[in-house]
Amino acid sequence: MSRITLAELAEKLDATVHGDGTVVVHSIASMSKAKEGDITFLSDAKYRKHLVECQASAVIVKEADVEFCQSNVLIMRDPYLGFALAAQALDTTPAPASDIAPSAYIADDAIIGEGVAIGHNAVIESKAVIADGAMIGAGCFIGKEAKIGKNTKLWANVSVYHRVEIGEACLVQSGTVIGSDGFGYANDRGTWVKIPQLGSVIIGDNVEIGANTTIDRGAIDDTVIESNVIIDNQIQIAHNVQIGSGSAMAGGTIVAGSTKIGKHCIIGGGSVINGHIEITDGVTITGMGMVMRAIDEKGMYSSGIPLQTNKEWRKTAARVHKIDEMNKRLKAVEKKLVD
């Protein structure tokens, strides 16, 4: 269990202590379930009423909310950011691996840095490079000439194919596959002819990738994920895709081949993005968005029909099928009015 005084935590968070800085906290809790030894946070004023009954040893709040608190306080401009930093300081998540397991296979010509941990039954193939402080979880596969950067963590059963490069301080969750073949085929009179995927996948620094996500290698050029990108679970990123730095992509999204997504974009869950298009910087696509064409102006975009009762939806669907007929009738009426 991690333990830290409020004064020490305030220094890490760049926060101001209001109350007893010697109080020790050891865990994060929600406001409704917090008890002595816990720290919680308030980032939305509509939950302010819960501060009266909160039993936490400390609360992270904005300065405007201090007067409503019954406990010690850490004052920050952004309490939600404070929550994230406090959670890091008190994190007790175990490491993917703690040393080099005897059951791990490591090729003789693989390069293993200082302080590397490799879990049971992991495979490190010829000329792969595992940089200082990297952690490779149990059952991982690191292909020939692949590179894993400093302090990067791979949880169990991650597959990194040949020549893939992953930068520093990245985190990849279990079951993810990086560098598998892109979906590339030619057609010879009805017979599919496989196109070997000759590119690779290049991932920058501080990238996080969720569980069971697949990132395909490029057909000729590389698939590129720039630094500081966060990618959720069960996402498909096809060959030759480029994702700009600082972008975020929620679960279940599919990005077709050769699409370029700009910097600081946010892609909502379950979105589908067509291939061979470009999305400019600063675009937000809400959940279940279907992007069929390029987006060259930043902003928020949505598609699809919001939730309705089944009865309402059936009526809407029926009307959609009649749009062409209604359009013809409307044009006929307009023509009569003009004549």
From Swiss-Prot:
**Its Enzyme Commission number?**
2.3.1.191
**Highest taxon of the lineage:** Bacteria
| Secretion signal, residue range per the UniProt entry | none
Catalyses: a UDP-3-O-[(3R)-3-hydroxyacyl]-alpha-D-glucosamine + a (3R)-hydroxyacyl-[ACP] = a UDP-2-N,3-O-bis[(3R)-3-hydroxyacyl]-alpha-D-glucosamine + holo-[ACP] + H(+)
Subunit note: Homotrimer.
Q: What does this protein do?
A: Catalyzes the N-acylation of UDP-3-O-acylglucosamine using 3-hydroxyacyl-ACP as the acyl donor. Is involved in the biosynthesis of lipid A, a phosphorylated glycolipid that anchors the lipopolysaccharide to the outer membrane of the cell.
Name of the protein: UDP-3-O-acylglucosamine N-acyltransferase
